[in-house]
Regions:
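Non-transmembrane, aqueous-exposed alpha-helical and coiled segments at domain scale
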Residues: 1-278
Length: 278
C-alpha cells in the first residue's frame, strides 16, 4: 500500500501528486525505494506539483501529541492548518524534490485532449465539510477537491464512486454495531488501517450516506467492492443513516444487489467480485 504515491505508477502512467495533498518527505522517498525494490520504476512517471505543501517534523510532533479524535498521527492536520494560515512550505522550496517537480497547470492545459484520472485518498465520510465533523480529515474528499488540481468542471466526463459492500472507520468515535458478524467481516476483509495498523470498526453499508455522497459528487458510475467478503461471511444487510434500528436484511446475495441497483437507478452500478481488481 502506498500512502503518497498515486496508483498510476504501477501501470507505467504519468502520475502527479497534486496541490490538494500534503507530503512527508521521508515517507515519499521510502515509498520510492520500496517500489523500485519491487521492480516498479517510477523515473519519468512520478511528479509533484510545485504548489503541493510539505509535512514538516514539527507537524509530526504536534500531531502525535494530539489524542482528541484518533488521527493517523502523520502530521496532516497541522500541515493543512499552516497551508491555510499562509505559513506552509511548498514542494518548490525543497531542493531534494527538484527532479520530481512539475507545473501542473501547464501539464494539464497543454494536453487538453489527454485522459486524466484523479485518484482520491480518503472517503466522502471523512471530508472536512461533508463528513461527520469533527471526526474527519483535514482536506476535501470530493469531486470538488479533485478539481482543485486545476481542472475546469466542464472537463469532467465521468465520476467513479467506489465503496465497500460494508462500511469501515478507524478513529475515536464509536462506530461498530453490536452484532458478532462485524468481527468476522474485519478478519475476512483484513480491515486494519493501512497507515496505523489499527483494527477498523465495521458496520453494514450505510446506503443513505452513500446516496448523499453520490449526489454531492455527481457520481456517474458506482463500484461496490469487497462483495467476496460478504459472500464468505454470508450476511447481507443495509442500514439507513446512523440509526442502528433502520436495517434491511436479505437472505440471498442477488436480492441485496437488486436493492442497491434500484436505489441507485440513475447510476451505473458494478459489483466487484474479486480481491484483485474489478
Amino acid at each position: 500500500v502506498t500512502h503518497h504515491i498515486p496508483a498510476g505508477v504501477f501501470f507505467g502512467v504519468k502520475s502527479i501528486i497534486g496541490p490538494g495533498c500534503v507530503v512527508n518527505l521521508e515517507q515519499f522517498f521510502k515509498e520510492i525505494e520500496e517500489l523500485e525494490a519491487g521492480g516498479i520504476d517510477v523515473e519519468g512517471n512520478l511528479f509533484i506539483a510545485t504548489n503541493t505543501h510539505i509535512i514538516t517534523p514539527e507537524h509530526l510532533r504536534e500531531d502525535q501529541e494530539d489524542t482528541k479524535i484518533g488521527t493517523t498521527k502523520r502530521g496532516n492536520g497541522p500541515a493543512y492548518r499552516d497551508k491555510y494560515g499562509r505559513r506552509g512550505i511548498r514542494a518548490e522550496s525543497v531542493p531534494a524534490l527538484a527532479p520530481y517537480l512539475i507545473d501542473i497547470y501547464h501539464e494539464l492545459h497543454s494536453n487538453l485532449n489527454a485522459e486524466v484520472l484523479c485518484e482520491g485518498a480518503q472517503g466522502f465520510g471523512l471530508d472536512v465539510d461533508w463528513g461527520d465533523y469533527p471526526y474527519v480529515t483535514s482536506s476535501h474528499c470530493t469531486t470538488a477537491g479533485a478539481l482543485l488540481n486545476g481542472i475546469p468542471p466542464q472537463s469532467v466526463r465521468k465520476v467513479y464512486g467506489v465503496a465497500k459492500a460494508y462500511e469501515t472507520y478507524v478513529g475515536a468515535k464509536k462506530f461498530e454495531g453490536d452484532e458478532k458478524v462485524f468481527a468476522q467481516i474485519r478478519d475476512v476483509g483484513d480491515e486494519y488501517g493501512a497507515t496505523t495498523g489499527r483494527p477498523r470498526q465495521c458496520n453494514w453499508m450505510n446506503i443513505s450516506l452513500m446516496k448523499k455522497g453520490a449526489n454531492i459528487n455527481g457520481v456517474t458510475d458506482l463500484v461496490i467492492n469487497k462483495v467476496d467478503v460478504m459472500r464468505e461471511v454470508n450476511s447481507w444487510a443495509i442500514r439507513y443513516g446512523d440509526d442502528s434500528s433502520m436495517i434491511s436484511r436479505f437472505t440471498i446475495e442477488q436480492d441485496w444487489k437488486d436493492y442497491i441497483q434500484f436505489y441507485f437507478k440513475d447510476v451505473d452500478v458494478v459489483f466487484s467480485e474479486s480481491p484483485e481488481r474489478i
